C-alpha cells in the first residue's frame, strides 16, 4: 500500500507582505512557506499552527483552506499530500 507523507503549509499575509522562511534544500538556500509534517494523533489544523509557531514564533489559527494537492519530490522520490492554509495577521 502506498502511503504519501502528509504535510501542512501556511501562506501568511500581513500589511501587504507575505512571510517566508529561509531553508537549505539540497545544498541551496531557498525561500519557503512555514511548513512541516503531520505528527501522530495531530489534526492538520493543529499541525499547521504548530509548524507556524515552531518556524516563526507566530501563534495564529488557520483561517482558510486554500488548497490540497499531491506532489512528488524527484530528488528523494517521496510523495506528499499537502494542506495549504491562509493566515492574515
Predicted regions and their residues:
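Residues at secondary-structure transition points
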Residues: 1, 39-43, 76
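Active-site-adjacent beta-strand/loop module that shapes the phosphate/pyrophosphate-binding cleft
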Residues: 71-89
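Conserved N-terminal beta-strand and adjoining loop/helix that marks the start
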Residues: 1-19
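Short connector loops at helix/strand junctions that flank enzyme active sites
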Residues: 5, 13, 33, 45, ...
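A short coil-to-beta-strand element that immediately follows conserved catalytic motifs
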Residues: 59-67
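Conserved Nudix-box catalytic region and its N-terminal flanking loop in Nudix hydrolases
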Residues: 14-54
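A structural signal for short, well-ordered beta-strand segments
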Residues: 8-10, 65, 83-87
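Generic structural "secondary-structure junction" signal
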Residues: 8, 33, 40, 71-73
Amino acid at each position: 500500500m502506498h502511503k504519501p507523507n502528509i504535510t501542512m503549509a501556511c501562506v501568511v499575509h500581513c500589511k501587504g507582505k507575505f512571510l517566508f522562511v529561509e531553508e537549505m534544500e539540497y545544498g541551496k538556500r531557498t525561500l519557503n512557506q512555514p511548513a512541516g509534517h503531520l505528527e501522530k494523533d495531530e489534526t492538520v489544523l493543529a499541525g499547521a499552527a504548530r509548524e507556524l509557531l515552531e518556524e516563526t514564533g507566530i501563534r495564529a489559527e488557520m483561517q482558510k483552506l486554500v488548497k490540497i494537492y499531491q506532489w512528488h519530490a524527484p530528488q528523494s522520490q517521496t510523495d506528499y499530500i499537502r494542506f495549504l492554509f491562509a493566515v492574515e495577521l
